[in-house]
């Protein structure tokens, strides 16, 4: 009798993707974040579904409905806290996943990389519209400030902003449509994840050395299933510790106050995972320039494959590129810190220097380092 796993049309796809998939034998824990992101997405969709059952997307009752979920719904507080902190885990895994891709040259699988960047943008959009839903002060003012950025677009800007608002300010129409977007986008993300995996399985995974791994492959199951489960358990433990012991650690205290259009919070800032981009936005005095820099801070990832000058794929054996990579990491941490600070000196100038160095490292220094390393590796015999 033939094995159903290998003959059934549907089981065969699952088998070729998660069971008999040939994998490089030497991929490290940095390759765990793909499966962790998949799990984050599933957790977010499930908790979000249960929250949507009790949430009302009306300006008068949205804030109260969230309070009702936490007080009156069975384990509603837990579902809400897992959903809110799950977003933080999602972005933490995303940043590490993208960082791994840059360090080990995974961006050379261009199709996988490009759909990954589009995925990152879609997840960011989903998180933004989701943050508006509790209808607290920071939800309202965050929505007002960020949607207002579109007014910087010449000629059509103001019309576009009012079209997105569904009126002349952020109001009931805005909240309702943001809820609709927040509900539909995760399913679009899910479809894009399938495409992301489809492109990845065309080429197979890269590995820490950057060398061709074809000569040494092992099956995904049981080796990497058990490894992924270990990573998953660790992530769930961290998520539950965060959600149960300090659920408001990463949130903004202003969001415990219901939205009030007549009262502006002293410091309008997004969640921690957007602070680096927010710092880049604020570091440019011109509105349109700031918006373009904000977009470029993410879209610059799309040109990274074109800027690869090294003869080696991975940074594992490239000390100069490694130094630049960790400088970039430190730079992003500085930008994240600056994004949460008020707009005053010395934060303004630090933010401006950090923004300049962010783009300089990626666009200029990394390609130059690759060329320098190529030159240093050439034999210099007379």
Swiss-Prot record:
It comes from the Eukaryota. Heme b b566 binds at residues 97, 196. One of its GO terms (biological process) is mitochondrial electron transport, ubiquinol to cytochrome c. Its main location: mitochondrion. It is found in: Mitochondrion inner membrane. Heme b b562 binds at residues 83, 182. InterPro entries: Cyt_b/b6_C (IPR005798), Cyt_b/b6_C_sf (IPR036150), Cyt_b/b6_N (IPR005797), Cytb/b6-like_sf (IPR027387), Cytochrome_b (IPR030689), Cytochrome_b_C_euk/bac (IPR048260), Cytochrome_b_N_euk/bac (IPR048259), Di-haem_cyt_TM (IPR016174). GO terms for molecular function: metal ion binding; ubiquinol-cytochrome-c reductase activity. Component of the ubiquinol-cytochrome c reductase complex (complex III or cytochrome b-c1 complex) that is part of the mitochondrial respiratory chain. The b-c1 complex mediates electron transfer from ubiquinol to cytochrome c. Contributes to the generation of a proton gradient across the mitochondrial membrane that is then used for ATP synthesis. Belongs to the cytochrome b family. The cytochrome bc1 complex contains 11 subunits: 3 respiratory subunits (MT-CYB, CYC1 and UQCRFS1), 2 core proteins (UQCRC1 and UQCRC2) and 6 low-molecular weight proteins (UQCRH/QCR6, UQCRB/QCR7, UQCRQ/QCR8, UQCR10/QCR9, UQCR11/QCR10 and a cleavage product of UQCRFS1). This cytochrome bc1 complex then forms a dimer. PANTHER family: CYTOCHROME B. This is Cytochrome b.
